[in-house]
Amino acid sequence: MIGAAIVAIPVVGVAVLGAEAMLAARGPDLTQGEPYDLDDIVGADKDGRTEHMVWLGDSTVAGVGASEPDTALPRVYAAGRGHPVDLTVLAVSGARVSDVVDDQLPRFPEGDVDTVLISIGANDAVHLTRAGDFERRYRQVLDALPAGADVVMLGVPDIGSVPRFAQPLRYLAGVRGGTIDAVIDDLADAPGRTYVDIAGETGPAFRRDPGTLFASDDYHPSDAGYELWVSAVAEAVEASDDRS
């Protein structure tokens, strides 16, 4: 019975994910309205060399779910760096990895960039991007980044915890998210790259306390949820620095 259920997932999954994804759009849509402009010099009053930081990705980077720009993931992470950060955020809500290649990389700033952070894959998981296609396009992103920049690759969050998705979408989306996440983890196994296990480090907390950690759309993280993401990123980067 278990084997039959596993075999049935790809067959049923396409129809269920498509139908349930449309049903999930019934709730409040926090992506409407003018997106946040997150570009800024963060911590300008701090001592030290300015770090040039670029973020690529989807709505989680664009600040959807955050109550204001300063509580968005890139701003909060930059504020905790302990030195000035020249922050550029190219992310767009709804983006898949192909959008990063086609629309965000062409806008990548010229000049020296110290750190690039990427959070992409959740939309690819829900919209059934093939793992091989995702890997190919993600490699294109990595190959286009400036030599010498530190690359921080955020994994796919625990989509199976999203309250807005009814079952069986939660389960199926979680499986798909894990597949895409494994690709990111593998690609991060190279010098100068750091993988952040967002699902593993934050997923259990989101499942325990969805009312606090999800925003009002029951889909994106809230301010408190993004704080957990920031902690996961900071800890992974610190651990990577200790190993190098």
Residue ranges and their predicted role:
Residues G160-S244:
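Catalytic His-Asp segment of secreted/periplasmic serine-dependent ester chemistry enzymes
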Residues S119, L154-G155:
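Alpha/beta-hydrolase-fold catalytic nucleophile elbow
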Residues A147-D150:
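A short helix->loop->beta-strand "cap" motif at the edges of active sites that frequently abuts
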Residues M1-V54, A234, E238-S244:
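N-terminal secretory targeting modules
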Residues V89-A91, G155, D197-G200:
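Residue-level recognition of beta-strand->loop/alpha-helix junctions
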Residues R136, Q140-A144, T179-D186:
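Alpha-helical scaffolding segments of alpha/beta enzyme cores, especially the outer helices
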Residues H52-V54, A62-R137:
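Conserved SGNH/GDSL esterase-like catalytic core that processes O-acyl groups on lipids
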